[in-house]
């Protein structure tokens, strides 16, 4: 029997937690904003099919696809446990634009590893699997980080801890918030977005960053949505990355005037997120972004909620 796993889009950083905070989101209208991976019995050790809206952006050689690397490291871990790897056929349905700031690579990695693990009756536990996901993300971006793979896999808002054998833990957030996600249809490379950042920061920025992040986490745990939203500020990346995102400053200004609680860059961009309390405000902001922030037919805007589930089985057939 095959298995199909869907892994949702995620917001790295959530503005206030550079490299240590991430949130999984899914559209309220039921659209699948994420990748799906099917694993079923095959005749050779590994074969790969690709499908989906952004299939043309994938490498033609299966061995250059990150899901092949996922299979390689999964096989390595099974070998350590003395468990036999089943011959399998994998299909990656690529629905996420690459270089979008929506955790596109994390979607493929999480869906592939979760599906591989389920197909083999879950020989790896959650932490072991998450560690592999971080390793794969590091292969793409040059450094192991979990701020997309953790929320994508586990759901909700995740805080990266990486102590006592704990990779990340969920932060209670506000179910009533709408998250408007706007992808303009242009590409920003994570490497370029990293290079633009300063190598050192001023003391007052470090203090502000600590206050905002601590304040946000405190407000989430004590149930203060207004305070939490006020704390969603970024002094680490946004001031420098804004110039890579045409129209971002105007979009943030409009969203605030329309009643949005906070607006920021999703991951390294170019996608932005805008948090709204009321659905009509979210829809008004979404309409404006569709007309003014989206630059071509590849761009899109979705009104989302937090995805509390993370990756999930959607059946056995794509």
Swiss-Prot record:
Catalyses: L-homoserine + ATP = O-phospho-L-homoserine + ADP + H(+)
* Domain of life, source organism: Bacteria
Q: Which GO terms describe its cellular component?
A: cytoplasm
In the Enzyme Commission scheme, what number(s) does this protein have?
2.7.1.39
Give the metabolic or biological pathway: Amino-acid biosynthesis; L-threonine biosynthesis; L-threonine from L-aspartate: step 4/5
For this UniProt entry, what is the primary localization, expressed as one broad class? Answer: cytoplasm
InterPro entries in the record, alphabetically?
A: GHMP_kinase_C_dom, GHMP_kinase_C_sf, GHMP_kinase_N_dom, GHMP_knse_ATP-bd_CS, Homoserine_kinase, Ribosomal_Su5_D2-typ_SF, Ribsml_uS5_D2-typ_fold_subgr
GO: which molecular function terms? ATP binding; homoserine kinase activity
Q: Any idea what job this protein has?
A: Catalyzes the ATP-dependent phosphorylation of L-homoserine to L-homoserine phosphate.
Q: What is this protein called?
A: Homoserine kinase
Q: Could you tell me which species this protein originates from?
A: Vibrio parahaemolyticus serotype O3:K6 (strain RIMD 2210633)
What gene is this protein a product of?
A: thrB
């Amino acid at each position: 029997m095959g298995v199909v796993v869907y892994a949702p889009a995620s917001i790295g950083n959530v503005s206030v937690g550079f490299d240590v905070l991430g949130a999984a989101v899914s559209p309220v209208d039921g659209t699948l904003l994420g990748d799906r991976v099917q694993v079923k019995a095959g005749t050779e050790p590994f074969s790969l099919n690709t499908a989906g809206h952004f299939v043309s952006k994938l490498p033609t050689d299966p061995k250059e696809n990150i899901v092949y690397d996922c299979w390689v490291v999964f096989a390595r871990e099974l070998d350590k446990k003395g468990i036999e790897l089943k011959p399998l056929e994998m299909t990656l349905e690529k629905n996420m634009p690459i270089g979008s700031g929506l955790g596109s690579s994390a979607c493929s990695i999480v869906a592939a590893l979760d599906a591989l693990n389920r197909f083999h009756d879950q020989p790896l536990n959650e932490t072991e699997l998450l560690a592999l996901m971080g390793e794969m993300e590091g292969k793409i971006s040059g450094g192991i980080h979990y701020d997309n793979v953790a929320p994508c896999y586990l759901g909700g808002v995740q805080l990266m801890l990486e102590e006592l054998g704990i990779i990340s833990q969920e932060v209670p957030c506000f179910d009533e918030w709408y998250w408007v996600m706007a992808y303009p249809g242009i590409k920003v490379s994570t490497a370029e977005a990293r290079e633009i950042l300063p190598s050192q920061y001023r003391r007052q920025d470090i203090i502000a960053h600590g206050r905002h992040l601590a304040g946000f986490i405190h407000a989430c745990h004590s149930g203060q949505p207004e305070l939490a939203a006020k704390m969603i500020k970024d002094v680490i990346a946004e001031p420098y990355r804004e110039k890579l995102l045409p129209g971002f400053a105007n979009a943030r200004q409009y969203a605030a005037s329309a009643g949005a609680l906070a607006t920021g860059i999703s991951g390294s961009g170019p996608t932005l997120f805008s948090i709204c309390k009321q659905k009509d405000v979210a829809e008004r902001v979404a309409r404006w972004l569709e007309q003014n922030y989206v630059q071509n037919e590849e761009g899109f805007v979705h009104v989302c909620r937090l995805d509390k589930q993370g990756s999930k089985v959607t059946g056995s057939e794509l």
